[in-house]
């Protein structure tokens, strides 16, 4: 199975991110699963795939988001249930269910279906097949063009996003693609963000092009809804911080996969192990005093690199997310222990907090 993936930018932090677009080919791993991960910044558009056929006129520019409301005083209640989605085929339903299973297991609120964002995500999945181009950025005049960037496409279909991410995968069935996405660094940061309340999912399939099964997931909150989006704090976390892999997780993959750009560019991305991570709400900057991964049975410390917003070479990491990336693939059938000692600083108030976590997980057989 080949899985090709690309992570999108945050609409709220695009100014500090680089734009990286293109078609990233899968590279085989020892598990016979090819995983290519790419992260692209700069939500305002950029290059994209070409395409044949008659050009279609671009849609009108989206209506600007309304002015921000006063700062919220506290988090909204986490969405522990959401309505059953309508209109999904088996693959999109599998992606929706798996995405929410991941968030719930990490102590985060679920994401509700947005039919407007579904249309935007589906249009972009169809655009990638029509133009055989795997990128977040559409080009005006190409077949199926609906907007240069994902926030513009969402707005065209009637949804004004505030913050959030678009993550994408290709060449696989949607449920498995979500599992591959959460095994990366940048993709995981988007999936485990506290702030989003809505999701739109698009998925298409064609055997005639290289981008054969594009999955598009837009994750955000509404800029026109003062109860669930604009002016509201993030969904509350039942755990205070979201760790991954979760405590007691089994069959954790051994490798990070071919994430592009490489979060640890000093070595080949395929030589990196599955990261451990901690996420907090978006207005907090998280830092580590100690972040250590050991083999539980022997106590052997695993050589690893901490990646956070303070040292991310690709300028893609949100300040609220920190990862520990092993310098080598994890060992099969092995239990690992993680210890995180750190803290947070709120961007607006300067209030500090303590985040101490310890947990364990077990790896897959191969």
Tell me what each language-model feature is.
Residues 2-6, 13, 21, 48-288, ...:
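Functional surface patches built around histidine and acidic residues
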Residues 19-24, 28:
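N-terminal export leaders
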Residues 30-34:
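Alpha-helical transmembrane segments
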Residues 36-39:
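C-terminal motif of bacterial Sec signal peptides marking the signal peptidase cleavage site
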Residues 41-45:
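Bacterial signal peptide processing site
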Residues 263-366:
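Acidic, low-complexity Ser/Thr/Gly/Pro-rich repeat segments typical of extracellular/periplasmic
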């Amino acid at each position: 199975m080949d899985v090709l993936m690309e992570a999108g930018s945050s609409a709220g932090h695009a100014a500090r991110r680089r734009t990286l677009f293109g078609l990233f080919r899968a590279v085989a791993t020892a598990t016979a699963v090819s995983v290519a991960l790419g992260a692209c910044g700069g939500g305002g558009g950029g290059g994209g795939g070409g395409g044949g056929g008659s050009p279609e006129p671009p849609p009108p520019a989206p209506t600007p988001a309304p002015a921000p409301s006063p700062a919220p005083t506290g988090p909204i209640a986490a969405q522990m249930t959401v309505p059953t989605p309508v209109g999904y085929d088996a693959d999109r339903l599998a992606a929706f269910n798996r995405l929410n299973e991941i968030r719930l297991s990490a102590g985060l609120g679920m994401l509700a279906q947005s039919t407007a964002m579904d249309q935007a995500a589906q249009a972009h999945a169809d655009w990638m097949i029509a133009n055989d181009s795997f990128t977040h950025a559409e080009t005006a005049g190409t077949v199926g063009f609906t907007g240069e960037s994902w926030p513009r496409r969402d707005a065209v279909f009637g949804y004004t996003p505030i913050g959030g991410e678009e993550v994408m995968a290709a060449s696989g069935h949607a449920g498995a693609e979500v599992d591959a996405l959460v095994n990366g660094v940048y993709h995981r940061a988007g999936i485990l963000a506290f702030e989003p309340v809505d999701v739109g999912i698009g998925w298409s399939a064609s055997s005639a092009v290289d981008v054969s099964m594009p999955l598009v997931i837009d994750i955000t909150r509404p800029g026109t809804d003062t109860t669930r989006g604009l002016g509201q704090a993030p969904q509350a976390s039942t755990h205070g911080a979201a760790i991954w892999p979760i405590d007691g997780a089994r069959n954790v993959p051994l490798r990070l996969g071919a994430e592009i750009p490489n979060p640890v560019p000093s070595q080949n991305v395929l030589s990196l192990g599955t990261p451990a991570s901690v996420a907090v709400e978006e207005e907090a900057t998280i830092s580590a005093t100690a972040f250590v991964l050991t083999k539980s049975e022997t106590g052997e410390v695993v050589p690893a690199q901490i990646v956070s917003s303070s040292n991310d070479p690709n300028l893609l990491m949100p300040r609220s997310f920190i990862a520990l990336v092993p310098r080598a693939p994890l060992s099969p059938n092995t239990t690992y222990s993680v210890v995180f000692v750190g803290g947070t600083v709120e961007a607006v108030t300067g209030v500090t907090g303590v985040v101490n976590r310890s947990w364990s997980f077990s790896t897959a057989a191969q």
